[in-house]
């Protein structure tokens, strides 16, 4: 969506239906965020029934309505997957996909009490959004609808999707069964594969990203899968490179830009610590960079030494990295929050005691952080 807005010079109001299924359901059902189950509700439910339920987290969509579900509770995951797959909790439990030794009686209690809790407090969860939308017949009528990443839809989401395209003149369903890696999370790729006999197929046979060596490796793996759509998929012209490393420490990432993928979030945290030790700057969507504020403070300080005035917020951010020897901070309380301040004025009127480079001035930043930031800059 953001790329479309930028590329075609649009606003958010120009694309009211460029959104996830959950976001569409949230909007058309006229819901408010305080009507949706949050972490505090699951915690409260656990205290009411006498044992911890764990917590549920929803990765937020661009409008804050949420989309992907994750939880540290295997009980909640079983309940979630049963809904996504249109089966009972008994059937999901019998699949034995959970990793812990769980009590079915506890599962039944949590499932029943969760339903009662939502009813008593007039709350819904994100699965309820999809189910309520499908039952409501509130889908707008479109001339054309595009459903992207369709291989990742669950049976429950397929029902919602059909309720949309049944009111649509033309429907384009985009996806790739070879990229269906979320079956464990409830995705029903079989529904996507079945569409090839119901719709006109418009295959994209030329990749513009995958070089030949990577393509060869990928095809050697994917061709072992028996139940898949047979397709022609050509690589880019360039050969590319393929290297195997058994540890992230052996990869030289000191030059260029790198994209690092991992199976789980905690693995990214370990990799981030390795990059941090090497003084390599990185961004992780799940974790704020340790030195983001320090980097902003150092940049503002360097600009101030060159004569650029500082805002009150910049002064606040800079001052927290200085000890009492470098800044008598009590005088900061007399500053006007809407004003700007030159470094000489800060020395004269507001307690600043030093005018040297940031890595010498920031005596309370911590040497490890300072060393990291100096390598990065």
Predicted regions and their residues:
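P-loop NTPase Walker
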Residues: 1-34, 216-219
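A short acidic, amphipathic alpha-helical/loop segment
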Residues: 7, 156-164, 271-274
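Short, polar/flexible loop-turn hinges at active-site or ligand-entry regions and domain interfaces
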Residues: 10-15, 29-44, 53, 140, ...
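Core RecA-like ATPase module of SF1/SF2 helicases and allied nucleic-acid translocases
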Residues: 23, 212-215, 265-377
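Accessory N-terminal region flanking or inserted into the helicase ATPase core
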Residues: 56-146, 155-160, 173, 183
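Conserved RecA-like helicase ATPase core segment
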Residues: 158-244
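Conserved interdomain hinge at the start of the Helicase C-terminal
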Residues: 241-256
């Amino acid at each position: 969506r953001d790329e479309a807005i930028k590329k075609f010079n649009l606003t958010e109001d120009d694309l009211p239906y460029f959104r996830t299924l959950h976001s569409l359901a949230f909007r058309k059902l006229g819901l408010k965020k305080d009507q949706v189950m949050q972490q505090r509700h699951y915690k409260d439910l656990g205290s009411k029934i006498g044992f911890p339920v764990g917590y549920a987290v929803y990765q937020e969509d661009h409008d804050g309505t949420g989309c992907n579900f994750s939880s540290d509770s295997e009980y909640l995951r079983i309940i979630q997957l049963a809904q996504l797959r249109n089966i009972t909790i008994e059937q999901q439990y019998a699949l034995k996909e959970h990793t812990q030794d769980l009590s079915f009686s506890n599962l039944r209690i949590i499932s029943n009490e969760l339903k009662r809790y939502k009813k008593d407090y007039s709350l819904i969860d994100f699965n309820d959004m999809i189910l309520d939308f499908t039952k409501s017949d509130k889908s707008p009528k479109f001339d054309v609808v595009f459903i992207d990443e369709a291989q990742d839809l669950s049976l429950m989401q397929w029902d919602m999707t059909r309720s949309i395209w049944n009111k649509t003149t033309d429907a384009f369903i985009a996806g790739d069964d070879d990229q269906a890696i979320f079956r464990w999370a409830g995705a029903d790729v079989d529904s996507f594969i079945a569409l090839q006999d119901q719709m006109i197929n418009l295959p994209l046979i030329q990749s513009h990203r995958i070089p030949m060596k990577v393509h060869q490796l990928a095809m050697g793996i994917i061709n072992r899968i028996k139940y898949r759509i047979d397709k022609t998929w050509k690589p880019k012209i360039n050969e590319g490179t393929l290297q195997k490393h058994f540890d992230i420490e052996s990869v030289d990432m000191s030059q260029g830009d790198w994209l690092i993928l991992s199976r789980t979030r905690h693995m990214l945290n370990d990799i981030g610590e390795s990059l941090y030790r090497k003084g390599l700057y990185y961004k992780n969507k799940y974790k704020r960079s340790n030195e983001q504020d320090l980097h902003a403070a150092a940049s503002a300080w360097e600009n101030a030494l060159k004569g650029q005035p500082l805002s009150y917020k910049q002064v606040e951010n800079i001052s927290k990295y200085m000890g009492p020897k470098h800044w008598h901070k009590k005088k900061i309380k007399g500053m006007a929050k809407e004003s700007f301040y030159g470094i000489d004025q800060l020395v004269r009127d507001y307690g600043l005691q030093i005018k040297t480079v940031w890595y010498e001035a920031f005596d309370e930043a911590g040497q490890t952080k300072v060393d990291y930031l100096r390598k990065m800059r």
